[in-house]
Each structure stands twice: as C-alpha cells, then as structure tokens.
Amino acid sequence: MALLAMHSWRWAAAAAAFEKRRHSAILIRPLVSVSGSGPQWRPHQLGALGTARAYQIPESLKSITWQRLGKGNSGQFLDAAKALQVWPLIEKRTCWHGHAGGGLHTDPKEGLKDVDTRKIIKAMLSYVWPKDRPDLRARVAISLGFLGGAKAMNIVVPFMFKYAVDSLNQMSGNMLNLSDAPNTVATMATAVLIGYGVSRAGAAFFNEVRNAVFGKVAQNSIRRIAKNVFLHLHNLDLGFHLSRQTGALSKAIDRGTRGISFVLSALVFNLLPIMFEVMLVSGVLYYKCGAQFALVTLGTLGTYTAFTVAVTRWRTRFRIEMNKADNDAGNAAIDSLLNYETVKYFNNERYEAQRYDGFLKTYETASLKSTSTLAMLNFGQSAIFSVGLTAIMVLASQGIVAGTLTVGDLVMVNGLLFQLSLPLNFLGTVYRETRQALIDMNTLFTLLKVDTQIKDKVMASPLQITPQTATVAFDNVHFEYIEGQKVLSGISFEVPAGKKVAIVGGSGSGKSTIVRLLFRFYEPQKGSIYLAGQNIQDVSLESLRRAVGVVPQDAVLFHNTIYYNLLYGNISASPEEVYAVAKLAGLHDAILRMPHGYDTQVGERGLKLSGGEKQRVAIARAILKDPPVILYDEATSSLDSITEETILGAMKDVVKHRTSIFIAHRLSTVVDADEIIVLDQGKVAERGTHHGLLANPHSIYSEMWHTQSSRVQNHDNPKWEAKKENISKEEERKKLQEEIVNSVKGCGNCSC
C-alpha cells in the first residue's frame, strides 16, 4: 500500500509538470506494480489498454486498483487516477488544446511532406542571385571571374614543367646533361621557379579574393533564410508548435543554417568548377596526347564519381541516424535542465544522466558506422585514381619510346592528373558534405512550406476599435478540438464595453477555449465572434491581437532582465511608462529592493522570481500594451490567498473603464464582476451577478460557491478528520468511484 501511495504521488506531480511544460516531454519513472502480488501494469500497457479513447483508464485497472485501495490513500489515489490519463497521450497525441501535452515529434518535420532537392537548390540560387540586390549579383559575377582565373592558372602550372623539361632536353641533346652545372641550375631555376611560382601565387590570389568577394553573398543568404524561417515559425498556428519539440526544432534550424554556407560554396565554387576543369584537362590531353589519354581520364573520373555517389548514398542513412540521435539527446538535455527542480524532487539525477547517455550511445554507434564506411570510401577512391594514373603514365612512357611524346609531355600529363586529383579528392568530400547538408536543409525548407491554418483573409481590413466600442460577442459558437468531441455547443453571450465579465464552470466546460477562440489561436467550426461589432475572421490578425491583452495562468518570462520583460508589452514605451505600469501592478517597490533593480535577471522562464512576482510582471506588461480588451485566464489560480488578494487589488485599478473577461476557478476572485457567466457542458447554463446567482440555492453557481466555501472552512476545522471517520466505508467507496469516473471524462490535460 505504501508503494501505491508513493507512485500515486509521483504520478500526480508528473501530471502537474506535464501541464506546465507543454513543449517538452515529461520524464516519469516507470510503474513497477500497482500493489501486492496482483498483476503488474507498465506505462506502455496502460496506453495499449485504453483503446476506446486514448485518455481513458482501462476498466480492469480501475477494478484491480480499487480492490487494493486503502482508506488512508483515497485522496492520493484520486490524484493518481487523474494523472494516469497522461500515459497514453505521451505515446500518441489526441488533444490539440492550447496547453495540452502529448507525444511531441522529435523529428521536426514528422508528418510533413519533404521538399525535393531540386527545389531546395532552386530556392538557394534565388538567394545567391537575388533580383532586388544588384550589388550582390555583381559580387557573384566578380567571384565567378576570379574563379575562372584561378582554374586557368592551375592548368598553366603543368605546362610550365613541360616547357622547362623540353627546353633542358634540347639544350643537352635529347639527354639531360648536368656537366655544365651553372647553366643547368640557372635554366631550371628560371623556368620552374618563375613559371611555377607565378602560377601558384596567381591561383591562390584569385581563390582568396573570390572567397572575400563572395563572403557577403553567402552570409546575406544565410541571414535572410534564417530570418524567414524564424518569422515563418512565429506565424504558424498553435497546433503546429504543440506537435513539435522545441529542442529538436532548434537543432534542425541550427544544422540547416550551417549547411547553407557549405552548399552555397560547393555549388558555385566546387562542383561546377570541377566539371569545367575535368572537361578542360580531357580536352588538353586529347589535343596534345591523343584520344586514348582522354578516354582513360574520362573513364577514371567516371568510375571515381560513380563509386563516390553510390557509397555516399549508402552512407547517408548513418547521417540520418546521427541526426535523430542528436535531436533526442538535445531534447533530453533541454527537458531535464528545464525541469531541474522536478529532477531534484525525486533524486533522479542518475536516471537523467543514464537516459541522456543512452541517446549519446546511439549517436556514438551511428557515428562509428559513418567513420568506418568513410575509411572504405577513401580507400576505394584512392585505388580507382591510382589505377587510372598508372594507366596514363604507362601510355605516356610508351609514347616517349615510340617518339610521339617527349619527356616534357610525361611531366605535363603527370602534373595535369595530380592537379586534377586535388579537386577530385575534394569532390568526394564535397559530395558527401553536400548530401549531408541537404539532409539538414531539407527540414529547414520543409518548414518554410508549412502553411498556417490561421491566416488573414485576402485584403483583410484592420480592426477599428476604441475602449468605448470594445464590445465582445459570441454568436452561436460551436467548437471541437477533436472531431466528435464537442467543447462548445452553440454558446452565445455579449460583454459590453468597459464592463468586467467573469466566466466560470467546472473542468471541461470550455472556459479557456473561449480565450483561445477570441485570440484566434483556433477557428470555431460554426458561429461567429465579434469584437467592436466586427467579425474577427474579417479583420487582420495583427490588429486583432494588438487590441487584446492576455494575462495567462502560467506567466512565462524571457531569460532577460525584469525591465526587458516589462517592456515586452510595448517595445516602444519610455522608461517612465514602464515604471508607471510596475507601480500600478504593485511591483515597483519590490523591484527596487532587488540588488540590481530593474536590471535583475529573471532566469530561465522567470524561475528566479516568485509566482506572485511573475504574475505581476504579466499584468504590468499587459497594461503597458494598453489594449481595449484584457483577458485573465485563471491568472491567480496558482497563487496563495495573500498574494492573490494583493494582485486582485492591482487588477481592480487596471480594469476600470476597460473591457475585461476573467476566466476563473476560484469564485471569490470574481464576486465584483458586472456579470458572471456559468458554463456547463459547453453551454451557457446561467448568467447574472454574484448575489443574483446565489439567490437560487439550486443553481450550479450556488453549488460551486458553497462547495468551495466548505472546503476552506473544513480545511481550518479540527473536527473535520473526526467527521470523516463517521462516513461509512461503502459511501466513501461509492463517492470515490464516481470521482474516478468523472475525472477521466476529459482529456486530463486541459479544460476541454
């Protein structure tokens, strides 16, 4: 029984962490057993058994755990039962709610259609040769000119050796005679050093100038592509981001942008120039030495290229495995560090290290395969080139014996082939790295092709709104996250301008969904939503979201200063305006007491601040935004009573003469609302003022109010435990069974 209680508590804590960390996978220690000697239930079995609905607890599990349930563990087990709903969702996402969790894709382009390589290259060339940047096109043209000069100088080098050797032979009568040492040394030094030195220096000069000129083109392309991807990701709808893990997405973008620079250089300065040089060398050999030399050269190069391409394609799968392992390792590290406190709570440092090491081991295995196959590729390339070079040299020696070629021709042929071997060796590397870079870039360009589900209509007009006209109206709105599971069923209500309206209801009634629909994170399947008398689907998203401020339940801050996070509400605001909203939110004095004042770093996700301080920052920056409409999505539900009262006092000053909608769980926070709307099963069940709704003792609101009030009283009443003892076991069992069944009606991760 103790084991059951321990795991129940762990599940409940894990469920809470899963709710908050919607962009990361939850780390939960496997369940060893339910209790005693009964059947053992593993996490994957829980997911497999829930066939009817992914979030349901199997009836067999309910029965077994109920039979082994002790009286003292009822509350803990109830929390655990709710948390059990999470397990199947980790395997497969069935809920797309605003803060729902689920199986996030470690592959950022999972479920997306790949972009063809030719389209990637075409898109790349559009950045290399931009129509709106003549200065960059001029740089590309100049770079190509320097490239041609460098290749020409490379071809000249073997000819320098040929003419030097031939002239020396002529001076000594067909045989190289070193009897006259001064003349010989002078002639060789002059011919080789001047010709070779000038050619090599010229080639190096052209290459370096080319790199310097083209550098701005490459960096500009990288910057523009990275910016476009980043902006596009922000424009995608919430559903896309809820199905992707942040760590994997970040790594994919990083690898893709790094691959851009390499592919740009490879396409413009390696692959095409190598092809040009191969044709040039083959033509020279055909003209100077005969068709046999050209055929052997082309045959060697063709075999070399075919072997390189075939082996590289085979090796590509190992790079894909490395990327996947790299993504998994990155996700594990980021998720574990973001959940630092949770790891400490359960003493799971070693478990996290072992889990992380498992991904690293997978990466190591794939990397070793890649390294060993690379050695095989390099040896094969060297063998093919050596065979071709040997054949060419044999043909050249036969030509010298026959008198059709000179010793200088032998030197020239050898020099041309060795000159060609440098880019050929690099060709293998370029092809391998280009293939790998294209794999990395595929995700980047695939993301750019993803179309958002929430977008402006053609020629959408900006929202015309003022605080005096900021009415909010829902007209027969129907909405469901998953087909067949309705969240809102024909809901209709209106919030007059400048009024405070509260929306309350039980879990799963659709309260938070209203916020997401009004902010257009989602579109209703039926019905319309109006703001200032205008259908929000007919106005631009930018103007709509500028007019609506949101104070979320879990305020997440940027890893920056307090001042930066406050200023984020309106980045053009003056320091005086920032200080004013901080005072209005009751935060100014607390900030001044900090060692660095407004320059205090808040830490990752604002974890250096208390919950109350984070909520006040969220309220302050919403005020700084100065929207006509403010939405409070259970903004104080996670705070203690004292902090809640302080923040509610600050809110009263904020909402004066401003349209405000409060999504509330604690009814005590909305007693002063102009109107309270009670939702039940996705419909407006009741509406009225606090006192008006309490006047009906059988109303849903009245029952909720008295239930919450009795909980507070019972919490402080020392006789409550004695009263519990008088409740019969049978009544307790029936009550708990009913609560368990009710707890699994929703998805368990959100308010649906």
Swiss-Prot record:
It is found in: Mitochondrion inner membrane. Pfam families: ABC_membrane, ABC_tran. Glutathione binds at residues 315-319, 378-381, 428. Disulfide bonds: none annotated. InterPro entries: AAA+_ATPase, ABC1_TM_dom, ABC1_TM_sf, ABC_transporter-like_ATP-bd, ABC_transporter-like_CS, P-loop_NTPase, Type_1_exporter. Residues 472-706 form the ABC transporter domain. ATPase activity is stimulated by glutathione. GO terms for biological process: intracellular iron ion homeostasis; iron ion transmembrane transport; iron-sulfur cluster assembly; iron-sulfur cluster export from the mitochondrion; negative regulation of reactive oxygen species biosynthetic process; positive regulation of heme biosynthetic process; positive regulation of iron-sulfur cluster assembly; transmembrane transport. PROSITE patterns: ABC_TM1F, ABC_TRANSPORTER_1, ABC_TRANSPORTER_2. Homodimer or heterodimer. Interacts with C10orf88/PAAT. Forms a complex with ABCB10 and FECH, where a dimeric FECH bridges ABCB7 and ABCB10 homodimers; this complex may be required for cellular iron homeostasis, mitochondrial function and heme biosynthesis. Interacts with FECH. Interacts with ATP5F1A. Interacts with COX4I1; this interaction allows the regulation of cellular iron homeostasis and cellular reactive oxygen species (ROS) levels in cardiomyocytes. It is linked to Spinocerebellar ataxia, X-linked 6, with or without sideroblastic anemia: An X-linked recessive disorder characterized by an infantile to early childhood onset of non-progressive cerebellar ataxia and mild anemia, with hypochromia and microcytosis. This is Iron-sulfur clusters transporter ABCB7, mitochondrial. It comes from Homo sapiens (Human). The lineage of its organism: Eukaryota, Metazoa, Chordata, Craniata, Vertebrata.
